């Protein structure tokens, strides 16, 4: 239905433009006063009448489509923009691209939403030498508002703000739809492909805390786009190529000479890496052999390739333990995947005349970028620049991506801006058509506000960090004596949910561009905007129906038969807050700042607490505790909050539990 509404809206606009053009032509012919043009005039008038008739039919069909029930949640801001866009066009038909500003109101006294277009329109009219007061413009806009299902009333405030009050029936119906059909968005990304490049550790090195942010942010972005209906390809651009493999293979040959026939028990790959690095730095003969191994690997020597694969497999097993723990799914496509494309990349840039030679290197200067790309080293080797150019081309032409998102730290910002600019320069993509974006992020700091390290100054291993999280979350649960009321299975589920949920939420709840301080004490605090608080809040909400002996089937029956009342101010506030979910997600789809979702879930939880403290869902006898009355419409509000929170958690990669 959403696609049909969009198509109808586009056709409406087109026909309105045609009518405007024909009306102008009719007026011109009338004003000419030349009777010889009467045949033309009659023909134009007839065409105009036909168009107006068709326009009327289209408008009716569009309204009929809008009135049909939809299974998707409505983005209230988008719907209000449609309504006010229509009003502005009707009030000021000659203005091209007038500003359309609809935002949630900051205070209840200003209504539920505000349209702040009048001031911008006043400025546009001033450039046409028409001085009109913004308040007059606001009044003119409100006079042209079409009939719609969502607005109860509008008020003009201040210099020209239009305060919008939603209809209670509209909000109630949307909440009922959410409960009956589940939390669903319109298929915004239908037939669109998104590639998310994230995590990307190096083979033979353990993942450390520096990889944590890319992995968590990238997974969450992927989940969001999947929920919005996009075809998402999650890529792990691992470092599985380069000179370091020469020393690893040479060390493997020495330590496990029968590696071709007997699987080598490498064990701790980190130790293995350090041993080979030490030899590479101190033994000249070993260093020469390491370089020979690199050449043989590039030449696809079968024995050397097998050694390389063995090392990659051992490393991959360790990486997968972390991905499994964090519930992250990725397709591995490392630097090795692009090796056979490198020569063609260099040739394409040469053929187009973009290559300069500098001290034996082949470099490419990109307009607007201060540092050139090095696409071929003086020794004939390729660079990260070459492999990243090969990757972006493959993703654009073979994968046919509509959007590519690179989740890599802020330190790589200049590099990626240069890669993107080079890809545009050579004509691989048009930024107006294809979105290529670097979702950068800051570093993880310790509580001393320096880079997060162990006490001995080593980089913190990610597996150790997650293990510490599990230990601390269990300590917290036992401190609250949850081990005495939960089964062993429930206790373990709660431990994992809190440990990994808190680590993810602490990251995602900060603006990704900023550095953030890693503190287990803060992230496990069950007060404030933390996963611990929200997970506890979620289990409390889920328990309300259970403690009132209301099961899932009864709730579903009530959702279809019981009208959700929003008469109490806290019911009304909560209902509106629930409906903001689609507009929050749309904002994140645009800017990729996931802390907005965390802030929203926290706001939803605190708004629910206000509601629950003021509005009885279950009324009990004060002496006996016996249930006297269940206010089912309020139980449904609880259920709607839980449904939206559950979907929010899912997008953030957090697994809530029913009991905690």
Swiss-Prot record:
Its EC number is 6.1.1.19. The modification N-acetylmethionine is found at residue 1. It catalyses: tRNA(Arg) + L-arginine + ATP = L-arginyl-tRNA(Arg) + AMP + diphosphate. GO terms for cellular component: aminoacyl-tRNA synthetase multienzyme complex; cytosol. Residues 1-72 are annotated as: Could be involved in the assembly of the multisynthetase complex. Coiled coil: none annotated. Gene3D superfamilies: Arginyl tRNA synthetase N-terminal domain (3.30.1360.70), HUPs (3.40.50.620), Isoleucyl-tRNA Synthetase, Domain 1 (1.10.730.10). A motif ('HIGH' region) lies at residues 201-212. Forms part of a macromolecular complex that catalyzes the attachment of specific amino acids to cognate tRNAs during protein synthesis. Modulates the secretion of AIMP1 and may be involved in generation of the inflammatory cytokine EMAP2 from AIMP1. Interacts (via N-terminus) with AIMP1 (via N-terminus); this stimulates its catalytic activity. Interacts (via N-terminus) with LARS2 (via C-terminus). Monomer. Part of a multisubunit complex that groups tRNA ligases for Arg (RARS1), Asp (DARS1), Gln (QARS1), Ile (IARS1), Leu (LARS1), Lys (KARS1), Met (MARS1) the bifunctional ligase for Glu and Pro (EPRS1) and the auxiliary subunits AIMP1/p43, AIMP2/p38 and EEF1E1/p18. Interacts with QARS1. Part of a complex composed of RARS1, QARS1 and AIMP1. The gene is RARS1. Residues 529-543 are annotated as: Interaction with tRNA. Belongs to the class-I aminoacyl-tRNA synthetase family. It is an enzyme of class 6 (ligase). GO terms for biological process: arginyl-tRNA aminoacylation. InterPro entries: aa-tRNA-synth_I_CS (IPR001412), Arg-tRNA-ligase (IPR001278), Arg-tRNA-synth_N (IPR005148), Arg-tRNA-synth_N_sf (IPR036695), ArgRS_core (IPR035684), DALR_anticod-bd (IPR008909), Rossmann-like_a/b/a_fold (IPR014729), tRNAsynth_Ia_anticodon-bd (IPR009080). It comes from Pongo abelii (Sumatran orangutan). Pfam families: Arg_tRNA_synt_N, DALR_1, tRNA-synt_1d. Keywords: Acetylation, Aminoacyl-tRNA synthetase, ATP-binding, Cytoplasm, Ligase, Nucleotide-binding, Protein biosynthesis. The keyword Glycosyltransferase does not apply. This is Arginine--tRNA ligase, cytoplasmic.
């Amino acid at each position: 239905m959403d696609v049909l509404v969009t198509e109808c809206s586009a056709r409406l606009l087109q026909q309105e433009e045609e009518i405007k053009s024909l009306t102008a032509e009719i007026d011109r012919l009338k004003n000419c006063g030349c009777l010889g043009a009467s045949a033309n005039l009659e023909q134009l008038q007839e065409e105009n009448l036909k168009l107006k008739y068709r326009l009327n039919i289209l408008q009716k069909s569009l309204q009929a489509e809008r009135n049909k029930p939809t299974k998707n949640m409505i983005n209230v801001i988008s719907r209000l923009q449609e309504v006010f866009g229509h009003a502005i066009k009707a009030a000021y038909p000659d203005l091209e691209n007038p500003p359309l500003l609809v935002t949630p109101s900051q205070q209840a006294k200003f209504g539920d939403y505000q349209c702040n277009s009048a001031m911008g329109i006043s400025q546009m009219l001033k450039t046409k030498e028409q001085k009109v007061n913004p308040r007059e413009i606001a009044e003119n806009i409100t006079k042209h508002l079409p009939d719609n299902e969502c607005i109860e009333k509008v008020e003009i405030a201040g210099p020209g703000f239009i305060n919008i009050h939603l209809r209670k029936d509209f909000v109630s119906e949307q909440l009922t739809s959410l409960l009956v059909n589940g939390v669903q968005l319109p298929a915004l990304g239908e037939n669109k492909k998104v590639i998310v490049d994230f995590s990307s550790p190096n083979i033979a090195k353990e993942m450390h805390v520096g990889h944590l942010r890319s992995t968590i942010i990238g997974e969450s972005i992927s989940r969001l786009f999947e929920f919005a209906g996009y075809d998402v390809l999650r890529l792990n651009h691992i470092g599985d190529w380069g000179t370091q493999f020469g020393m690893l293979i040479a060390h493997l040959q020495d330590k496990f000479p029968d590696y071709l026939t007997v699987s080598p028990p490498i064990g701790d790959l980190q130790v293995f890496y350090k041993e080979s690095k030490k030899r590479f730095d101190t033994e000249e003969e070993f260093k020469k052999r390491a370089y020979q191994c690199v050449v043989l690997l590039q030449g696809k020597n079968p024995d050397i390739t097998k050694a390389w694969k063995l090392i990659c497999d051992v490393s991959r097993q360790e990486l997968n333990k972390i991905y499994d723990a964090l519930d992250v799914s990725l397709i591995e496509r490392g630097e090795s995947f692009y090796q056979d494309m490198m020569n063609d990349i260099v040739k394409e840039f040469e053929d187009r005349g973009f290559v300069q030679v500098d001290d034996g290197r082949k470099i490419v200067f990109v307009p607007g970028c201060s540092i050139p790309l090095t696409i071929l080293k003086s020794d004939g080797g390729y660079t990260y620049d070459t492999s990243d150019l090969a990757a972006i081309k493959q993703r654009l032409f073979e994968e046919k991506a509509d959007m590519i998102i690179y989740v890599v730290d802020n330190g790589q910002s200049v590099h990626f801006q240069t890669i993107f600019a080079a890809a545009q320069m050579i004509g691989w993509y048009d930024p107006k058509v294809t979105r290529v974006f670097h979702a950068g992020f800051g570093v993880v700091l310790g509580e001393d506000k320096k880079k997060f390290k162990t006490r001995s100054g080593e980089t913190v291993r990610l597996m150790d960090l997650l293990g510490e999280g599990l230990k601390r979350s269990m300590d917290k649960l036992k401190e609250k004596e949850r081990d005495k009321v939960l089964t062993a299975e429930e206790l373990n589920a709660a431990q994992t949910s809190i440990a990994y949920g808190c680590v993810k939420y602490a990251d995602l709840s900060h603006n990704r561009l900023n550095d953030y301080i890693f503190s287990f004490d803060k992230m496990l605090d069950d007060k404030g905007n933390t996963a611990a608080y929200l997970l506890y809040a979620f289990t409390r909400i889920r328990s309300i129906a259970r403690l009132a002996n209301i099961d899932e089937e009864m709730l579903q029956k009530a959702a279809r038969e019981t009208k959700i009342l929003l008469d109490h101010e806290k019911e009304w506030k909560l209902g509106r807050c629930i409906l903001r979910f689609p507009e929050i997600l749309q904002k994140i789809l645009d800017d990729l700042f996931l802390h907005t979702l965390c802030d929203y879930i926290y706001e939803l939880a605190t708004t629910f607490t206000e509601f629950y403290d003021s509005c009885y869902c279950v009324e009990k006898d004060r002496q006996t505790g016996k249930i006297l009355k269940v206010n089912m419409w309020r139980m449904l509000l609880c259920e709607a909050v839980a449904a939206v929170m559950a979907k929010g958690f899912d997008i953030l990669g957090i697994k809530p539990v029913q009991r905690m």
